[in-house]
C-alpha cells in the first residue's frame, strides 16, 4: 500500500520552477507534466513540443515564449502574460486562463476546446484564429466558439 519507491523517485525528480527566472530557457520536447511555473518569468523561453499537461503558469510572465506544438492541456494559466507567444498547433484543451493576456499571440492551429478564457480574450483571439490542430483535427475558430 502507499506510494511505491519508483513513484516516489519520479516525484522527487520533478523540478519546481515556481518564482524562478527561466527567461530564454530551453525546455523543448521535455516531459514537464504537472510542473509548476507559477509566478515564474519565462520570457522568450522555448517550450516547443513539450508535454506541459496539467502544469501551473499562474501569475507567470511568458511574453514571446515558444509553445509551438506543446501540450498545455488542463494547465492553470490564470493571470499570466502570454503576450506575443507562439501557440501554433498547441493543445490548450481545458486550460483555465482567466485574467491572462494573449495579445499578439500566434494561435494558428491551436486547440482551445473547453478552455476557460475571459470573454475579451476570446473575442481578440477569434479575430486572428485560423487553422486546424494537427493532433485533434479541431479548427481553432471552432475550439474558441467564434
Predicted regions and their residues:
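Tandem repeat scaffolds
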Residues: 2-145
Amino acid at each position: 500500500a502507499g506510494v511505491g519507491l519508483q513513484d516516489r523517485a519520479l516525484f522527487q525528480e520533478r523540478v519546481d520552477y515556481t518564482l524562478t527566472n527561466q527567461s530564454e530557457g530551453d525546455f523543448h520536447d521535455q516531459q514537464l507534466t504537472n510542473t509548476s511555473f507559477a509566478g515564474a518569468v519565462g520570457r522568450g523561453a522555448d517550450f516547443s513540443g513539450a508535454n506541459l499537461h496539467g502544469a501551473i503558469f499562474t501569475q507567470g510572465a511568458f511574453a514571446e515564449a515558444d509553445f509551438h506544438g506543446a501540450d498545455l492541456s488542463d494547465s492553470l494559466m490564470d493571470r499570466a502574460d502570454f503576450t506575443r507567444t507562439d501557440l501554433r498547433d498547441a493543445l490548450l484543451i481545458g486550460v483555465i486562463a482567466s485574467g491572462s493576456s494573449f495579445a499578439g499571440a500566434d494561435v494558428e492551429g491551436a486547440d482551445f476546446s473547453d478552455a476557460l478564457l475571459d470573454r475579451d480574450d476570446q473575442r481578440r483571439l477569434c479575430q486572428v484564429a485560423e487553422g486546424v490542430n494537427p493532433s485533434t483535427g479541431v479548427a481553432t475558430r471552432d475550439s474558441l466558439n467564434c
